[in-house]
Amino acid sequence: MSSDGLIVEMRNVSRKYRFFSLQDLSLALAPGQIMGLVGPNGAGKSTTIRILMGLVPADSGEVRVFGHSMKTEQALAKKQVGYVSDDMRLFGQATLEWHMKFVASIFPGWDPAYAATLLERFNLKPAQPVKGLSHGEHVKALLLLVLARRPKLLVLDEPTTGLDPVARYELLTELMDVLKDESRSILFSSHNTADVERISDRITFIDRGRIVDSNDKEAFLESWRRLRLDVHDGATLPAAEGVVDVDVTGRIATVITRRYAPELHQVYRNAGALVREVQRMTLEEIFVATVMASRKEPAK
C-alpha cells in the first residue's frame, strides 16, 4: 500500500488518441471505499480503467496500486486486483466449473467455500457450458470468478451494459448483498447514475477526458438544490457563489446551485426576488448540471 494509505493513486495521467484525450487526470481510492466513476459514453471511463489495469500505457503521469507502480511493478500491483469488464469473454465450449478450476489453479487465494456460496446466490449451475449463459448470467459468472479469489480491490468497468432493467436491478441487488459485509475497495464505472448511486459511497464525474467533480455521494445530494423564484419587474439576479445555472422566463426564475445555504434566500430577496421553492436534486440531475457547467468553462 502507498505511504499515505491509498489503494489506487493516479496522478496527472494523460493519454492522447487521434480524436480523444485523457487530460491530466488525478484519482485516489481509499481502503474500503466504493467509488463510482460516472460519465457519458466516450467520456474516458474505460480508458481510465484500462490505464489503471496496465492494459493501456499512459503518455504521462503516475499510476500506483497498493503502492506499486504500474509502470515498473505491474505484476505485484495486480496481484490483489479483481477486474470485470463488459467486453470480457469466457471459453464458450467449457463449463463454469472448468473455469472455476482453471482460476483456482492460478490464484492461491481462491476460496472454494465462497465460490460455492456465490454459485447459490447468483443461481448459477457449474455444469452448464458458458455458451448457454444469458448475458446477465455471463456477468454473474465473471463476478464469481473474480470475487472467489478474495481480491482486495475490485474494478468493475460498465458491468451492467446491455442488461435489461430487470436483469440490471437483480444483478446490482445481488452484488450489493455479496459486498455488504466486505471491506474491499471498489472502483465501479458506468454511464448509468442510478446504478452508481445504489452501490457507491463516493462519486467521480468524468467528461471529455477530464475529472469535472468528485465528492462523497451524500455531500453531492445534500449540497445541490434547485430553487424556484418569483422575480420582480426590473430585478437582476446577482452572481452568487456556487450557482451553476440560472434560467429566467418572465417573472419566474430557476436557479441551480452546488452550494445551497439558507442565506441564499436573503441574497435574492435583497435583489428583488423571492425563493418560492427549494428542491432536492437526483444524482442524475446533479451529474448533468455538473457536466453542462463544465462545458461552459473556457478550455484549459
Residue ranges of model-derived segments:
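Alpha-helix termination/capping residues and helix-transition junctions
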Residues: 19, 197, 240, 270-272, ...
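C-terminal coupling/interaction segments
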Residues: 2, 251, 256-300
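ABC transporter nucleotide-binding domain
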Residues: 172-261, 277
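ABC transporter nucleotide-binding domains
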Residues: 5-207, 213
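Generic alpha-helical secondary structure signal
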Residues: 20, 75, 113-116, 218, ...
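Short loop/turn segments at beta->alpha junctions
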Residues: 95, 216, 279-282
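Short, surface-exposed beta-strand/loop "edge" segments at domain boundaries and coil↔beta transitions
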Residues: 151-159, 234-237, 262-264
